[in-house]
Structure formats: C-alpha cells, structure tokens
Amino acid sequence: MGQKINPVSNRLGIIRGWDSNWYGGRKYGETLLEDSRIRQYLNARLAKASVSRIVIERALKLVTITICTARPGMIIGKAGQEVDKLKEELKRITKKDVQINIYEIRKPELDAAIVAENIARQLEGKIAYRRAVKMAIASAMRMGAEGIKIQVSGRLNGAEMARSEMFKEGRTPLHTLRADIDYALAEALTKVGLLGIKVWICKGEVYEKRDLAPNFAVAKNQSRRPNAQGGNNRGGDRNRRRKGNR
C-alpha cells in the first residue's frame, strides 16, 4: 500500500506533524472549512512566493499561521508592510486576531511542493518536460537528496492520447515509514490541456524521535542539536559526584 497512499499522510504522527493543530468540538466542520479558505486565499495571494506549506494553530481568540516559503522577503515586504497588510486581510476571514510566522526554506531544491510548482511553471512556459524534469532531479541530488522520483502525466508534447512518464534517480522507499519522504502534486495549464506533476523526494531516514510540534524553529534546533550528554553518560555523572564530594 505504500505505493498507493499519500506518503505524507502515511507518516503522520511518526515523523511528520499535522498542518492543522486545534480542537474544534461541535464546530469542527466550520473550522475545517475556514482552514481551507485560508489556504486557498494564501496560495492565490502568494502564488509567486514559492510557498511550500501552511500550518494553522488555533487558540480561543488567536489564529497562528506559519508560512513555509523559499522567498520570505516577498511576503514580509519593505519594513514589514506586506505582512501587516496580509494580517489584516486574514483577520477579516477569521474574525479573530491573527499572528503570522514566516519560516524560510533554505534548500528549496529538496522541497517537493516547490520543485513540482517550478516544473509546472516551466511547462506553462513551453519548456520541454524532459529538460525541466532532468534539471530538477540534478538539482535535488546535488543538494543532498538520497533519491527523487517525478511523474508527468497528460498530453505530453501535444500527443493525442494522454500518458504518464516516470523519471527516477536514487532510492525512494515508500514502504519504509522512517524514510523522510516529501510528496507534492502540481498542475500545469498548457494549450494542449492540463498536465499533472507528482514529486517524491527522499531526504534520508529518521532513527531518533522527532518533535512533531508545529514550532519549526524548536523542531529544527532539536533535530540538529541532540542532548550533548546523551542517554548513557555514566562517566560524566561519576566525575560530577567526585567534584561534589570534594
């Protein structure tokens, strides 16, 4: 089933956190619909800002929105004018106070959503699909990906019959739940019809427990800097006891 299911949803609660973090109770449906409106609005409003992921957290009177983007400057604007304007627009949608956090993606070549969107924009610009895909694969492998798989579907090169073509390099173990696999789907509207682009990127395997909290800065620091003492630090404890006895 690893080949059929969405790799992101298959790893929720294991190595991947949720994009919506709140308790809705009886208003679950209304809150979920509002989340969908927020994401649709932000994706349309920030179409050129290379937005990868939008995480929404809710408190009683506050909505915290974390936007993961490769171009934070386009969202923040000069002296923060654009992000303040965006905050006021979101307040009208949610009818609550809104806090916006911007998280910069430092390696967009390893982000499936950004890679898929870039390929889609190139296909709309009449660039050959094989060239666009091979450039994306080369960039991802150069930036340290363990493997990447890209599927392009539709009327490729204007053919009368639609077909799918797959490009692979490296390893993408979809059945291995500890494998950190990012997945995204994008669509390109061309003169011959709609083309679909699916991207799978394997960034390695996660062996230690990962913090699934939506606070990206905390999760990033914890994953990069594990506890210096470690789980088995008998020598250090013994030295501290000797110093205390003296």
Swiss-Prot record:
Superkingdom of origin: Bacteria
Ribosomal protein in keyword set: yes
Any GO BP: translation
A GO cellular component annotation in the UniProt record: cytosolic small ribosomal subunit
GO terms assigned for molecular function: mRNA binding; rRNA binding; structural constituent of ribosome
InterPro entries: KH_dom, KH_dom-like_a/b, KH_dom_type_2, KH_sf_prok-type, Ribosomal_S3_C_sf, Ribosomal_uS3_bac-typ, Ribosomal_uS3_C, Ribosomal_uS3_CS
Residue ranges constituting the KH type-2 domain according to the UniProt record: 38-106
Quaternary structure and interacting proteins, as annotated: Part of the 30S ribosomal subunit. Forms a tight complex with proteins S10 and S14.
Stated role: Binds the lower part of the 30S subunit head. Binds mRNA in the 70S ribosome, positioning it for translation.
NCBIfam families reported in the protein's UniProt record: rpsC_bact
Name the record gives this protein: Small ribosomal subunit protein uS3
Name of the gene encoding the protein in the UniProt record: rpsC
